[in-house]
């Protein structure tokens, strides 16, 4: 995250101290908000981190869930039960050599479907959060193009605006 801070600071996209950046990260990723946004009855029960790294189920559909470590842990704990992860396949879209891959995948989780998902595999959650944060700050609501291990990639981020503040709504490769 220090490199993300340095990048954003060097390019004038974040002007505070490292402590300010930590507080900003905590707020955009971990502060809870109402994902429905417009509901008459506000239910605070989601965060950017939960959506992107852990996943959510609503109306029998999986949303978010773009982290391979969480996917692996849930798949491992399923032990073939009908609840948990039912992995239906993947396609490697980009390969970063020994540093991981970018895949698209299809699966069910506790009976809910993820018809099309994408995630990095073999990368650290810290790297993923750093890349997503950079894209959120620099290219919010736009496609963020960059290279990872000399391989061109695209990351998409969406904001969730509540209480006059932009939180991470989602982020994915």
Identify the role of each PLM range:
Residues 1-147:
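N-terminal "domain-start" segment
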Residues 141-173:
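A cross-kingdom marker for long, charged
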């Amino acid at each position: 995250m220090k490199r993300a801070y340095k990048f954003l600071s060097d390019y004038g996209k974040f002007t505070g101290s490292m402590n300010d950046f930590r507080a900003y990260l905590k707020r955009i990723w971990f502060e809870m908000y109402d994902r429905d946004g417009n509901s008459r009855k506000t239910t605070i029960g989601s965060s950017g981190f939960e959506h992107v790294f852990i996943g959510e189920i609503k109306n029998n559909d999986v949303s978010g869930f773009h982290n391979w470590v969480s996917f692996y842990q849930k798949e491992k704990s399923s032990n073939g039960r009908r609840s948990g992860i039912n992995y239906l396949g993947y396609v490697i879209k980009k390969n970063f050599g020994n540093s991981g891959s970018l895949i698209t995948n299809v699966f069910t989780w506790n009976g809910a479907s993820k018809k099309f998902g994408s995630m990095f595999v073999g990368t650290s959650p810290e790297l993923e959060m750093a890349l997503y944060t950079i894209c959120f700050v620099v290219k919010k609501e736009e496609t963020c193009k960059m290279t990872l291990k000399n391989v061109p990639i695209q990351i998409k981020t969406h904001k969730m605006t509540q209480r006059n503040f932009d939180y991470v709504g989602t982020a994915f490769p």
